[in-house]
Amino acid sequence: MANDLFNSFMSGPDEQGRFGIFGGRFVSETLMPLILSLEEEYEKAKTDPSFWAEMDDLWTNYVGRPSPLYFAERLTEHLGGAKVYMKRDELNHTGAHKINNVLGQIILARRMGKTRIIAETGAGQHGVATATVCAKFGLKCVVYMGAHDVRRQAPNVFRMRLLGAEVIPVTSGRGTLKDAMNDALRDWVTNVRDTFYCIGTVAGPHPYPAMVRDFQSIIGKEAKEQMMKAEGRLPDTIIAAIGGGSNAMGLFYPFLDDTSVNIIGVEAGGKGVNEKMEHCASLTGGRPGVLHGNRTYLLQDDDGQILEGYSISAGLDYPGIGPEHSWLHEVGRAKYVSITDMEALEAFKLCCATEGIIPALEPSHALAHVMKLAPELPKDHIIIMNMCGRGDKDIFTVAKFLGFDMSDTEGRDAED
């Protein structure tokens, strides 16, 4: 918990970009000047009223913020315990939380004179958000996406291309988010003069984890204000799904010093957290190491080689986690649990049936933990879960798992 060294859980990172022993910047000599230049530009922007005025205008008039805080009445009644609220970031322009951060980074890129934006993407939501903002500002956009994810997230691939982005399928490794990030970093090293790397999560070398967190914390700031208006007090528990952890950090950060609020992050348990490593639960089943420029919890073998991991959710299919989450885990301010594919699918179906909301598979993991937790809590206990993305992109994946033949115009089950 907070001690004399940390008067606030919100004080990190330090000047070297570290949260305790986590974070930092482990990058090549070629990239270090870029990283330092980005940090300098962001530090200037943070205290520049014109920067935040532009952000606020775009958040309001382009993204559609604030997103609603919605009382899920029928879901609450079905679960029979705590009151469940959803922070509806799936209603943002582009359908997820990702655009909150992309706007900030691309405004920074323009201030730095960069004309080419590169990004990595897993579920495709960060890629779509990046392509969207690049189209708005007339910037060249290149998105690296694992070949496996290109296949399972076809709707988002088409959206990116419609928006003018070049989508590059990455075939190395297992063709997922980790591999896409590797190739994006290689591109950045090669094209340092005109290129800005727009990272989609709270990972990577400093200042990315803190910068992305700051842009995403609009989620938690709004939720806190909206909850005070709705209930006259803070929530008892806040819950969010975690891949790299940007939507979760965005919800959690404004509540870190409110120690009465329980904070729970939900990792992707895949087929179960066991020695087979068919999951992406880095905190539940991993250990500290270095990947993509920062020290954090990772899935790795006994020799320190990074493992591929697995999840039904492309956006959670990452073998690491943001360093601030690793620190919050170690100091005990947040609790981290895992949810399996099948539990997430059950939550997906329940949300559709009770609330008329089709969630993405990523927040379905958070919702699955709500389904476990809420019935055990009193009716005056208040939960906020972050509905960080909509499920349009996942209908083909879900249909396959549920045995529904999408190619059949009659809409029959596959076994019929």
UniProtKB/Swiss-Prot annotation:
One of its GO terms (molecular function) is tryptophan synthase activity. The modification N6-(pyridoxal phosphate)lysine is found at residue 98. Its cofactor is pyridoxal 5'-phosphate. Pathway: Amino-acid biosynthesis; L-tryptophan biosynthesis; L-tryptophan from chorismate: step 5/5. The keyword Amino-acid biosynthesis applies. The keyword Amino-acid biosynthesis applies. It catalyses: (1S,2R)-1-C-(indol-3-yl)glycerol 3-phosphate + L-serine = D-glyceraldehyde 3-phosphate + L-tryptophan + H2O. Keywords: Amino-acid biosynthesis, Aromatic amino acid biosynthesis, Lyase, Pyridoxal phosphate, Tryptophan biosynthesis. Gene3D superfamilies: 3.40.50.1100. It is an enzyme of class 4 (lyase). GO terms for cellular component: cytoplasm. CDD domains: Trp-synth_B (cd06446). Its EC number is 4.2.1.20. Belongs to the TrpB family. The beta subunit is responsible for the synthesis of L-tryptophan from indole and L-serine. Tetramer of two alpha and two beta chains. This is Tryptophan synthase beta chain. It comes from Ruegeria pomeroyi (strain ATCC 700808 / DSM 15171 / DSS-3) (Silicibacter pomeroyi). The lineage of its organism: Bacteria, Pseudomonadati, Pseudomonadota, Alphaproteobacteria, Rhodobacterales.
